[in-house]
Structures are given as structure tokens and as C-alpha cells.
Amino acid sequence: MKRTILLLSLLLAAAAYAQPSEPAVNYYAKDGTVQASDGTVYSVDGADSPTITICNAENRYTAADASSSLYYKDGRRLETVEEYGRVDGAVADQEAFTRIFRDMFTDEQIVALRNLRLPLAVGCAVNPEDGVQFEVSFVIGNYPELTSLSPDFYRTFEKRLKEEVRWHVNDFAKQLKYMFGLTIFNFRKLPLTSELEEKPAE
């Protein structure tokens, strides 16, 4: 009798293990808008393409259909390739940027994202005066690992990037009303918790 119960338990466990897992929710399955729990609305563009743009619906400069033109503070538009080539800037504290990613993603997510091609890029509009990212948008690979992350996730992500990341721009860029920044993030360079542990002294 005990053997029968044991065999039955093993069969039930095997059957449960064999059940296909539920497909991940895709919050960005179609173009349009989605809403975070705090009421923030995000525009979704490219849901049927390899990459999807997710940006705050209030964004003016980094929306999917926004102009890529830049302007001097006096209102003149940059006209030449040479002018655009002189605009330069970079994240001032790369460690702050990396820390946000470490906080936002679990080790399991990082491992999965390391295996994907171009999973995530962060675009932004930067105030050249203080280096603040006043607009942030996300371009994600159309992968379940990223489309299953809720609008609340991207809302928190956006807020932290705006609050904690600053850009250092060159003198030419400081003549502009705003400039654009783009960071294509390489998850293979993002350490896991185990990789952050101190190595034993030799």
C-alpha cells in the first residue's frame, strides 16, 4: 500500500512538472498606450517589430515620432553635419547607471538578458546646463523577458534614471536647448550578486 502511494505521488509530481508553464504576460503586445498604477501613461510603438519603444506619453523630444533636430538657445536649428558632430556628452557617473540596473533586475533576469541580442537601450533628452535627463525612453528587444515587465517597472526605472543619472557635456553642447543621449546596455558587463562578492585574499 505504501509503495502504491509512493508511486502515485511520484507520478503526480512528474505530471505537474511536465505541465507547460503559463506564457508570460505581454504588456506591450500592441501599439497604443499602457498605464502605470500611479496614472503615468506610456506610449508603445513597434509592438510587431523586433524592437519596441516605450516612452512617457508626455515626452516631447524622445517620442517615437519626434524630430531629431537640435536647436541653439537662441532658436536657430543646427543645420550641418559638422555642427551635429561637435555635440558630445556621456554619463558622468557610470557606476550610478550600473547600480540602477543592478537594483532593477534580479540575477535570474540578468542571466537571461545576457543571452539576448541588443535587449535594451535607454534614450534621453538632456538639459546641457545641469546634465539632467528630463526625458527618458526605452527601446527594448521584443522578448518575453522584457515585455513581461509591467508599466510600473518602467515607471520606477524612468524615475530613478531621471533622479540619479547626470550627463557631462562639452562646451559646444552647452549652447543648445537640449541634446540627445543613448546608452545601449550590455548585460554581460552587469555583475551578478555572486560576482560582486569580494575575492578571498591570496
What is the role of each PLM region?
Residues 8-9, 170:
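A periodicity- and composition-biased signal for non-globular, repetitive helical segments
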